[in-house]
Swiss-Prot record:
Listed InterPro entries: Flavodoxin_fold, Flavoprotein-like_sf, FMN-dep_NADH:Q_OxRdtase_AzoR1, NADH:quinone_OxRdtase_FMN_depd
Family membership noted in the UniProt record: Belongs to the azoreductase type 1 family.
Gene from which the chain derives: azoR2
Note describing how the cofactor binds: Binds 1 FMN per subunit.
SUPFAM superfamilies documented for this protein: Flavoproteins (SSF52218)
Subunit architecture: Homodimer.
Protein name from the UniProt record: FMN-dependent NADH:quinone oxidoreductase 2
Cysteine disulfide partners in this protein: none
Classification via Gene3D superfamilies: 3.40.50.360
Sample GO molecular function, one term: electron transfer activity
């Protein structure tokens, strides 16, 4: 049995395309892997705090030297990190906001990219510790950006996933959603066709 962790980050709810893609993924994954467990963390409904001095301080101190506020911040970060460590498959649903990812998703990443936990420093440079995991990134984009210099979403997420040792990453883009005509339908159809091959 595998554990699947899904990270939702769209600020929209019912009309969110990235959430639609997530639901399609869940339906197809459950049909193909009925014994797997799926955990969904919704960063829009339950936002993760941005990094602050308490969390940064807590990371740098031994347990006995942490203040109550530092310990509280660290406990939240530990919960997020433990979810990721326990997962075999990571799914990130990310609409493109201003050529990049939602700030809620960036905040989550800031909590789980942790030295000594998800990566470590070595004499030859950083080494990711989450090898053996798979990741899928489901994106929704108003325009068509794949392969262009305006895409600061896929390159960034590939970089951070690789940094923590997740190199098996597949991106599924629903593009051109706001371009009018039949672009919206084509973008969804292409994304759904790729999703059908995932499970």
């Amino acid at each position: 049995m595998s554990r699947v962790l899904i990270i939702e980050s769209s600020a929209r709810q019912q009309d969110s395309v990235s959430r639609q893609l997530t639901q399609t993924f869940i339906q197809q994954w459950q049909a193909a892997h009925p014994g797997d467990s799926i955990t969904v963390r919704d960063l829009a409904r339950n936002p993760v705090p941005h990094l602050d001095a308490n969390l940064l301080g807590g990371w740098m101190k031994p347990a006995e030297q942490r203040s109550a506020a530092e310990q509280d911040s660290l406990q939240r970060s530990n919960e997020l990190t433990e979810e990721l460590l326990a997962a075999d498959v990571l799914v990130m649903a990310a609409p493109m906001y201003n050529f990049a990812i939602p700030s809620t998703l960036k905040a989550w990443l800031d909590h789980v990219l942790r030295a000594g936990v998800t990566f470590k420093y070595t004499d030859t440079g950083p080494q990711g510790l989450l090898t053996g995991k798979r990741a899928y990134v489901l994106t929704a984009r108003g325009g068509i950006y794949a392969g262009s210099t305006a895409d600061h979403q896929e390159p960034y997420l590939r970089q951070v996933m690789g940094f923590i040792g997740i190199h098996d990453v597949e991106f599924i883009h629903a593009e051109g959603l706001n371009l009018g005509g039949d672009f919206h339908e084509k973008g969804l159809n292409q994304a759904n066709a790729k999703l059908a091959q995932v499970a």
